[in-house]
Regions:
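Residues forming the flavin
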Residues: 1-187
Length: 187
């Protein structure tokens, strides 16, 4: 049930009995893992594009920088395979349904200027079996090109990472813009 709407079994997305792949390693990814396990997923795998961070203190991120350390949530403890330094390169489908994701190992090279490390694809690829893929990827900031007037954006994609309540409000504003556009032809 969502806002008083009931979804049929055919419309409902569930992890029950599925091989779930979570792409992204943050809090949202952790929530996806926990929900998938509680719904009875056959397997849960989480991939992260960044390298595996160290446990405990990380000399690469001294105070006052945000500490980049390995975090294991209660959702991870419920069970999942965690893999690092993998980039998804394509989705594989059969009969209109996803059945796998091709991933490529990446190396991270120090930036010559001491800035953000540079990602380098290795050419080592494999297919991960998945019949449910959950995208939990972050981003640095929204980089919106000039969009056609009939394309609307809301939430994190419009304003950057924020609270869910702000994303919901953004969705409401976007819905009003869509309605105005559809009824008047004006943005």
């Amino acid at each position: 049930v969502l806002a008083g709407q009931t979804f049929s079994d055919e419309e409902r997305i569930t992890a029950r009995g599925k091989d779930v792949l979570v792409i992204g390693g943050g809090d949202t990814g952790s929530d996806c893992i926990g929900t998938s396990n509680r719904q009875g997923a056959a397997s849960v795998t989480q991939i992260e594009i960044m390298p595996k961070p160290p446990v405990g203190y990380n000399p690469a991120t001294p105070w006052p920088q945000w500490p980049v350390v390995l975090k294991t949530s209660s959702s991870h403890e419920e069970g999942c395979v965690r893999r690092w330094s993998l980039s998804s390169t394509r989705f594989i489908g059969e009969n209109g349904r996803v059945c796998g994701v091709e991933v490529e190992e990446v190396d991270w090279l120090p930036a010559p200027d001491g800035g953000r490390p540079q990602m380098r694809p290795t050419g080592r690829k494999e297919i991960l079996k998945a019949d449910l893929v959950l995208l939990a990827m972050g981003f640095l900031k929204p980089q919106l090109p000039d969009l056609p007037e009939n394309v609307f954006v809301a939430g994190d994609a419009a304003s950057g990472a924020s609270l869910v309540v702000k994303c919901i409000a953004s969705g409401h504003r976007a819905a009003q813009e869509v309605d105005r556009y559809c009824t008047t032809g004006q943005r």
